[in-house]
Amino acid sequence: TVKAYLAKDALGEYAIPAIRQRPILLMGPPGIGKTQVMEQVARECGVALVAYTITHHTRQSAVGLPFIRQRNYGGKDVSVTEYTMSEIIASIYAKMEATGLSEGILFIDEINCVSETLAPTMLQFLQCKTFGNQAVPAGWVIVAAGNPPEYNKSVRDFDIVTLDRVRRMDIE
């Protein structure tokens, strides 16, 4: 699936446009090697890999920190809240600069164990490929991983709408 998402046509455009690429969801017991599988896939495809265990993150590190900026709307000065770049998105750009690779895999582990405050952000991420107002760069495939509920009591079940937006692969 990663190779298919990264394949380009004769004009150099992605054969499957990013908007049609559903994130891949790997489900399997802890310690089975989901992260190692993604490391191998990245090596074989010749792309970068940025891996995050999302349970170690807060909403602020995922969407960015808020700051106040002065704007003028309709001749009236107002204060508006904007956000810094997401730590996760910034890591993708840092990896691109460090490796010289413009394509890669963003691997988010333990996605179904996120805190209640981060769950809506993860749903937006899976649906829109964004963290806050920043999109995952073109050429980056989203892969998430999780554990079935029988292996982890803090697992949140994905609703049918979310499952419809991912390409689930069970690993045993």
Task: Report residues per predicted region.
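AAA+ P-loop NTPase catalytic core and its hallmark functional loops
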Residues: 1-172
